[in-house]
Amino acid sequence: MVLILGRRLNREDLGVRDSPATKRKVFEMDPKSLTGHEYFDFSSGSSHAENILQIFNEFRDSRLFTDVIICVEGKEFPCHRAVLSACSSYFRAMFCNDHRESREMLVEINGILAEAMECFLQYVYTGKVKITTENVQYLFETSSLFQISVLRDACAKFLEEQLDPCNCLGIQRFADTHSLKTLFTKCKTFALQTFEDVSQHEEFLELDKDELIDYICSDELVIGKEEMVFEAVMRWVYRAVDLRRPLLHELLTHVRLPLLHPNYFVQTVEVDQLIQNSPECYQLLHEARRYHILGNEMMSPRTRPRRSTGYSEVIVVVGGCERVGGFNLPYTECYDPVTGEWKSLAKLPEFTKSEYAVCALRNDILVSGGRINSRDVWIYNSQLNIWIRVASLNKGRWRHKMAVLLGKVYVVGGYDGQNRLSSVECYDSFSNRWTEVAPLKEAVSSPAVTSCIGKLFVIGGGPDDNTCSDKVQSYDPETNSWLLRAAIPIAKRCITAVSLNNLIYVAGGLTKAVYCYDPVEDYWMHVQNTFSRQENCGMSVCNGKIYILGGRRENGEATDTILCYDPATSIITGVAAMPRPVSYHGCVTIHRYNEKCFKL
């Protein structure tokens, strides 16, 4: 091994000879005699690069070794092509290819500010730059132009830290323009969570229509009450009333007018001159009035509460049993499909009964009848979380169904232990009375019953022990009469129906099929299949989707599955499991206040 030394030795020293190549003195050494490493990796660290950059920056200030002048807005910046090219792929492409700029001493760049170029060069030559609220926008745009991603990201991060109700909408628009998805999302989330404050600032009034709708239609909008949304929309419209008046109806379709307090609705909304002079808004006002009278019977996207108000739509499962001949369950439990949480409510009274009927009236729940020949009717007060006995049925029954139509409860058909019943009773909650109305054309038990387009529909059922019906019987409360409509494609009993968006959906009956009926056009269609056959399942509409809960399988055992069908996509998915298998239970949707409501 040869070890090169950096000093001269006396020729007389033992073992020294002249190097023929360099005339320097070297030692002849045996590698075996070395006890340490054969080499030493030395690094001065990042300070070396910093020192070089510092010197280059001094060269730039002194115009020493500069080989290009960048001209921006008439101001000249002497620079080094090598430094610019090393830092920016934009300049590397400009100077390293056969472009005209690679040969010219003076290169003019348009579209940026001279001040921005000064900040940019400060970063290029020092690795440091001061980002402020005054320069962040043009510094971001300059770093984007010159493809300096590190500086660009630093500017975006700085903007995130500056979010405030007075500027978040402007920053969001900036992020959208420059495809900054992370910053855009954070701005939108911030604006949703501080909407009450955001809507008071000038930026809010300068939103375009689509941007405004994007906020007011969101379920994630954080507000104390829906009145805040209405007032924000009206402020926006009145800001440029002549231009924005034609947009009022479209905007109000995204305000949940039915959820406004009735007093506020009457004293503020209905008397607003702009609304009064907009006939196209009358239908929205009518919908709100109907909801104030009918409650949850009247469902639309505008009747779904925003979660930030503390209220949410929940599915309430009432009673049921685990298997045929099994123990009747006393439980009343609510399920929130958004959070997946189950909560216990007051237990069902006199739970020894089975095969009763359940429906929701406004925001309360009714349970009627039950095996054997019970006339009892109970109502669950959702505000007090208690069950209250109300007026009894005129005729005891079980295997019947209930539905609400125009604010009144209808008990339909059923079985009295000997015969299928055609009798129909109507309950007025204000007078607490049951009255007989026109009977069914065909007596059935275990049909599917729901209301839609102002009429009551009784679908299928069992006219006797051995047969199933495919008839669809429609009741008109104005004429107190029944008509037969288009038959369901398959005759079934123990089926369940719900209505959504003026369509009726039917499932159960030990079939996988989910059918949809259009009562206006009077025709049926098969829309989807469930994953297994079941009957006597629960079915309810919640958050604009249809949920199928539990039911009894072909072997007689109950199931704990929950399926969710989305009519918008026609996709059915398995969601979760119920606390226990159950069938012959009631399922309804109500609004419930959450103890753990959303807070910032």
Curated annotation (Swiss-Prot):
Its main location: other. The keyword Cytoplasm applies. The keyword Manganese does not apply. It comes from the Eukaryota. It is found in: Perikaryon; Cell projection, Axon; Cytoplasm; Cell junction, Desmosome. Expressed in the brain. InterPro entries: BACK, BTB-kelch_protein, BTB/POZ_dom, BTB_POZ_KLHL24, Kelch-typ_b-propeller, Kelch_1, KLHL24_BACK, SKP1/BTB/POZ_sf. Kelch repeats lie at residues 314-363, 365-407, 408-454, 456-502, 504-544, 546-592. GO terms for cellular component: adherens junction; axon; Cul3-RING ubiquitin ligase complex; cytoplasm; desmosome; perikaryon. Autoubiquitinated. Autoubiquitination leads to proteasomal degradation and is necessary to control KLHL24 levels. GO terms for molecular function: ubiquitin-like ligase-substrate adaptor activity. Forms homodimers. Interacts with GRIK2. Component of the BCR(KLHL24) E3 ubiquitin ligase complex, composed of CUL3, RBX1 and KLHL24. Interacts with CUL3. Interacts with KRT14. Necessary to maintain the balance between intermediate filament stability and degradation, a process that is essential for skin integrity. As part of the BCR(KLHL24) E3 ubiquitin ligase complex, mediates ubiquitination of KRT14 and controls its levels during keratinocytes differentiation. Specifically reduces kainate receptor-mediated currents in hippocampal neurons, most probably by modulating channel properties. Has a crucial role in cardiac development and function. This is Kelch-like protein 24. The lineage of its organism: Eukaryota, Metazoa, Chordata, Craniata, Vertebrata. The gene is Klhl24.
